[in-house]
From Swiss-Prot:
Dimer; disulfide-linked. Its main location: secreted. This is Ampulexin 2. Expressed in venom sac and, to a lesser extent, in venom gland. Not expressed in brain. One of its GO terms (cellular component) is extracellular region. The keyword Secreted applies. Residues 1-26 form the signal peptide. It comes from Ampulex compressa (Emerald cockroach wasp). Amphipathic peptide which probably adopts an alpha-helical structure. Has no antimicrobial activity against E.coli DH5alpha or B.thuringiensis. Is not cytotoxic in vitro. It is found in: Secreted.
Length: 50
């Protein structure tokens, strides 16, 4: 059950990350929404745990 929740969580963050890529390049931090940046940071932490 926990694995399913983690998988769903990572998929959601991946989708959010793809939208942030469309709105602006990753290097332009001024245009990144703080919530999207927070989600990307969580996604990086999730990848490190695996």
């Amino acid at each position: 059950m926990k694995a399913i929740m983690v998988l769903f969580y990572v998929m959601t963050l991946t989708i959010i990350g793809s939208f942030s890529m469309v709105s602006g390049s990753p290097g332009q931090n001024d245009y990144v929404n703080p919530k999207l940046q927070f989600a990307c940071d969580l996604l990086q932490k999730a990848k490190e745990r695996q």
